[in-house]
Amino acid sequence: MRVKVTLACTECKQRNYNTTKNKKNNPDRIELQKYCRFCKKHTTHKETK
């Protein structure tokens, strides 16, 4: 089952991206390298509630 998740920048805490994930394959919180337009660089984005 795919669920909607929000990704937040670890440096400025802005919630920049919405995506979906498969809870069966990824039961833990995901971390991705994404571009943050507020920091103006690529940073780690973590899944938030």
Swiss-Prot record:
Keywords: Ribonucleoprotein, Ribosomal protein
Annotated GO MF terms: structural constituent of ribosome
SUPFAM superfamilies, per the entry: Zn-binding ribosomal proteins (SSF57829)
Pfam families attached to this UniProt entry: Ribosomal_L33
InterPro entries reported in the protein's UniProt record: Ribosomal_bL33, Ribosomal_bL33_CS, Ribosomal_bL33_sf, Ribosomal_zn-bd
GO BP term (any one): translation
Gene Ontology cellular-component annotations: cytoplasm; ribonucleoprotein complex; ribosome
Similarity section: Belongs to the bacterial ribosomal protein bL33 family.
Protein name: Large ribosomal subunit protein bL33
Organism: Clostridioides difficile (strain 630) (Peptoclostridium difficile)
Gene name per UniProt: rpmG
